Amino acid sequence: ALADGQQNDAVLVPHSDAAYAVEHSAGDLSQGSKIHSLHNFITAPKPFRDLLLAQREPLADSNVKDDDMTARALSSKDYFLLVGPPGTGKTSRALRSLVEGELAAGCETSLLLMSYTNRAVDEICSMLKDAAIDYLRIGSPYRCDPRFQDRLFANAIGDDATLTSMKQLLAGTRVIVGTTTTISSHEELFSLKRFSLAIIDEASQIPEPDIVGL
């Protein structure tokens, strides 16, 4: 496989007269993340499972009567759905407003921003860059727009990073970005950092098993 090529060409010598075929190799990261996410869901506390199975209403702060979308979303205790046609500013304006509002709520707040595709995550990174909001992106450099590769975690920590410096970098960065598949496959992130708010952009396009355990 090109992703993890055979390093010892001597393996092929006994079969040098054979014919070979090149085929697509489907990685198991996405499938494994789905299974892991489902496991997290079925082992989660019953109130959480009841919420996602529509067995109870999502909770919100009853004191908030504001018609402002940001105030209503940030007052939600379980989840808040923002629905709108493409091109109506859900990422460029609404998401930015939510991020800025949560960060302004206190220095102890931190956010996890996700989407299904790397292209959509690029859009989130573009919004954060325009808003001058510091962030780290978890993911592969091969699937990240060159404009944002300096904010990839692997690049930000440098070549001489230690476990302590990596923990400090995560602790000191209030916004973490990645695809749902990548974040699901890096569960150690949740043992190193606690998030006050998670936002999934374009969530309606994502199969439930990809996000039900996040």
Label every model-predicted segment.
Residues 192-211:
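SF2 helicase catalytic motif II
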Residues 91-100, 209:
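Motif I (Walker A/P-loop) of helicase-class P-loop NTPases
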Residues 83-84, 114:
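Residues at the beta-strand->loop junction immediately N-terminal to the Walker
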Residues 1-75, 126-130, 138, 145-155:
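Pre-ATPase regulatory/linker segments immediately N-terminal to the P-loop/RecA-like helicase/translocase core
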Residues 9-15, 53-56, 104-198:
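Conserved P-loop NTPase motor core of helicases/translocases
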Residues 76-82, 108-109:
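Pre-Walker A (Motif I) flank of P-loop NTPase domains
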Residues 87:
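Walker A (P-loop) phosphate-binding loop of P-loop NTPases
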Residues 68-69, 81, 93, 120-123, ...:
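Acidic, Ser/Thr-rich intrinsically disordered and amphipathic helical segments
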